[in-house]
């Protein structure tokens, strides 16, 4: 199968590309290196076709989606702080206009399916377990653009017969996060600090929870959606492990994995609309894709440190 992965040199994208190559698929990678890094793909650089560019370049997207079976869209302004007043216009342009260009080109070039990244941020502070049929009110511009993606995908499925499946990613950690720097997952940020003997900084009391899911599991979910024989029209699915871990518990697990006894530093919460709890309901994902995560948080940490 010939698959285009946008944002394929980034954190999640590169994990997906590695999995697709291992599976024997023909992969085209598109990335503009805003946060992606060539180093993320160096081990498989001779097994992929690479195109440097942005999903906002309509002529380029129309050109490279010819003879493609599936598009896996991971390109995005992928963190709420990127949507400051100064960056708002360009971030929305990438997430909304860029994604619509992907969908339009897919229809025009007879691409069978678009698999794309949405976000659990859409749920805001809805009480867990978070279900795909919940009423959602996005708490920030980032989440709003991702909800718009879901609406656009559903309309392209309804009006043009394009198969689409969006993943509401929970809190992803794993390999290849270096390019995300300050936008990296809390697991990775805490790990980086503790490996240097520094105290990780926790906003608030540390009782806030996240559904931490390992990047290898996320890549496998994308692979399953790409390869699925089912008709996936306008689907939206949670990707998590279905278990909540507090930041205090995370520190305990990191200390155990590192053989350390480093205490966190607690500071006042400066973030408005901060998400306090997160745990996915994964029943629909199991039913539609037959997917469930293989890695617990402890197992994921061991795998990262092993590599």
Label every PLM stretch briefly.
Residues 141, 179, 183, 215, ...:
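Amphipathic alpha-helical segment in the mid-to-C-terminal domain
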Residues 205, 234-237, 246-251, 259-277:
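C-terminal "lid/loop" region of Rossmann-like NAD(P)-dependent oxidoreductases
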Residues 218, 222, 239, 250, ...:
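Non-catalytic, hydrophobic alpha-helical segments
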Residues 16, 222-226, 254, 301-305:
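Hydrophobic "lid"/C-terminal helical patch
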Residues 147, 172-188, 198-199, 203, ...:
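Glycine/proline-rich active-site loop of Rossmann-fold NAD(P)-dependent oxidoreductases
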Residues 148, 152, 156, 186, ...:
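Hydrophobic alpha-helix immediately C-terminal to the catalytic Tyr-X-X-X-Lys motif of short-chain
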Residues 215, 270-292, 299, 303:
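Conserved C-terminal active-site "lid" loop/helix of NAD(P)H-dependent oxidoreductases
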């Amino acid at each position: 199968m010939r698959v285009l992965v946008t944002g394929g040199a980034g954190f999640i994208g590169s994990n997906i590309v590695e999995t697709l190559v291992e599976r024997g698929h023909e992969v085209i990678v598109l990335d503009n290196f805003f946060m992606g890094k060539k180093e993320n793909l160096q081990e498989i650089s001779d097994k992929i076709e690479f195109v440097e560019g942005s999903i906002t370049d309509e002529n380029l997207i129309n050109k490279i989606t010819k003879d493609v079976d599936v598009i896996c869209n991971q390109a995005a302004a992928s963190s709420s702080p990127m949507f400051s007043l100064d960056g708002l216009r360009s971030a929305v342009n990438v997430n909304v206009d860029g994604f619509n260009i992907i969908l339009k080109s897919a229809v025009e070039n007879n691409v069978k399916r678009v698999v794309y990244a949405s976000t659990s941020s859409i749920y805001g502070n809805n009480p867990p377990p978070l279900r795909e049929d919940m009423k959602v009110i996005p708490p920030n511009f980032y989440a709003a653009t991702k909800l718009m993606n879901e609406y656009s995908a559903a309309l392209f499925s309804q009006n043009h017969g394009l198969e689409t499946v969006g993943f509401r990613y929970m809190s992803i950690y794993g390999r290849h996060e270096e390019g995300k720097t300050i936008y990296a997952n809390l697991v990775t940020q805490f790990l980086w600090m503790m490996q240097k003997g520094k105290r990780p900084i926790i906003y608030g009391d540390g009782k806030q929870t996240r559904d931490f899911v390992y990047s290898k599991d996320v890549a496998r979910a994308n692979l399953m959606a790409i390869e699925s024989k089912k008709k996936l029209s306008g689907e939206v699915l949670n990707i998590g492990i279905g278990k909540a871990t507090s930041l205090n518990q995370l520190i305990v697990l990191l200390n155990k994995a590192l053989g350390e006894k480093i205490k966190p530093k607690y500071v006042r919460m400066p973030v408005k609309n901060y998400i306090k709890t997160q745990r996915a309901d994964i029943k629909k994902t199991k039913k539609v894709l037959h997917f469930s995560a293989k890695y617990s948080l402890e197992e994921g940490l061991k795998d990262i440190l092993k590599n």
